[in-house]
Amino acid sequence: HLQFHCPRVERNQAKKNFSCKLCDKVYTSLGALKMHIRTHTLPCKCDICHKAFSRPWLLQGHIRTHTGEKPFSCQHCHRAFA
């Protein structure tokens, strides 16, 4: 009966079959699960202070705290930001 009454509900429940073994999260695609697993493994590590990040762009932003690089600036006041 549920299959005919609420087919979307059943389909959505059937799709959620990629579970994280480290926590209770469940994903609808293997790619989404792989991206999530990076939050546990933190593969991007800073060579200077050894702080770890899940995404490379987060590490790149962090490295600017060591280098002092400020690549972004305000068009109005010209103040620079990391």
From Swiss-Prot:
Swiss-Prot/TrEMBL keywords: DNA-binding, Metal-binding, Nucleus, Repeat, Zinc, Zinc-finger
Top-level taxon of origin: Eukaryota
Zinc finger motifs (C2H2-type), residue ranges? 1-5, 18-40, 44-66, 72-82
A Pfam family annotated for this chain is: zf-C2H2
The cross-references to PROSITE patterns, in alphabetical order and at most eight, read: ZINC_FINGER_C2H2_1 (PS00028), ZINC_FINGER_C2H2_2 (PS50157)
Q: Main site of residence?
A: nucleus
Which protein are we looking at? Escargot/snail protein homolog
- Organism of this sequence: Bradysia coprophila
